[in-house]
C-alpha cells in the first residue's frame, strides 16, 4: 500500500470518527435537553407539592384552632341553662326580700342565701348587669317603657325592673329597664 492510500484511509477514518463524534455529541445534547426538561418538570412539581403541603398544614392549624375554641366555648357556656334557672331563682329571692322587713330573721336568711348564689354564679363567670344611670344599650338592655325626666339625658336608664346577666362577656339575659325622656311641655317655657 502506498503512502497516499494510507493517508486517504486515515483521512476517511478521521472523517468517520468525526461524524460519529458529531452524532454522539448531537445525541448527548438531545439527552441533556431531555434531562433538563425532566428536571424542570420535577422542580415545578416539587414547588406545587410544597405549596399543597403548606396549605394543608395551614388548614390543619386552622381546624385545630377552631376546635380548641369550640371546646373552650362549650366548657365556658355549658352552664348556661342552669344559670338561667338560677337567675330566675335569684329574682324570686329578691322579690321576697322586698316584701319582708329588714330586721326580720327570715329576711336576713334569704339575703345570705341570695348573696351565696350570686357569689357562686360569679365563680362561673356569670355577672349581674345593673345599668342604673347608664345610657341605654340595646345589646345589654331591654327597654320596657319611657318615663318623663327633664333632669336626665334622654335614653338614660332611670329604673331597673329586672337585673340582666352576662356569662363570660356573653349576654345571658338583658336587663329590663325604664328610660328617661324629655317631657312634651319641656320646650314650651
UniProtKB/Swiss-Prot annotation:
It is found in: Cytoplasm. Residues 1-37 are annotated as: Disordered. Residues 17-33 have a biased composition (Basic and acidic residues). The keyword Chaperone applies. GO terms for cellular component: cytoplasm. GO terms for molecular function: adenyl-nucleotide exchange factor activity; protein homodimerization activity; protein-folding chaperone binding; unfolded protein binding. GO terms for biological process: protein folding. Keywords: Chaperone, Cytoplasm, Stress response. SUPFAM superfamilies: Coiled-coil domain of nucleotide exchange factor GrpE, Head domain of nucleotide exchange factor GrpE. Its main location: cytoplasm. Disulfide bonds: none annotated. It holds the Pfam family GrpE. InterPro entries: GrpE, GrpE_coiled_coil, GrpE_head. HAMAP family: GrpE (MF_01151). Participates actively in the response to hyperosmotic and heat shock by preventing the aggregation of stress-denatured proteins, in association with DnaK and GrpE. It is the nucleotide exchange factor for DnaK and may function as a thermosensor. Unfolded proteins bind initially to DnaJ; upon interaction with the DnaJ-bound protein, DnaK hydrolyzes its bound ATP, resulting in the formation of a stable complex. GrpE releases ADP from DnaK; ATP binding to DnaK triggers the release of the substrate protein, thus completing the reaction cycle. This is Protein GrpE. The gene is grpE.
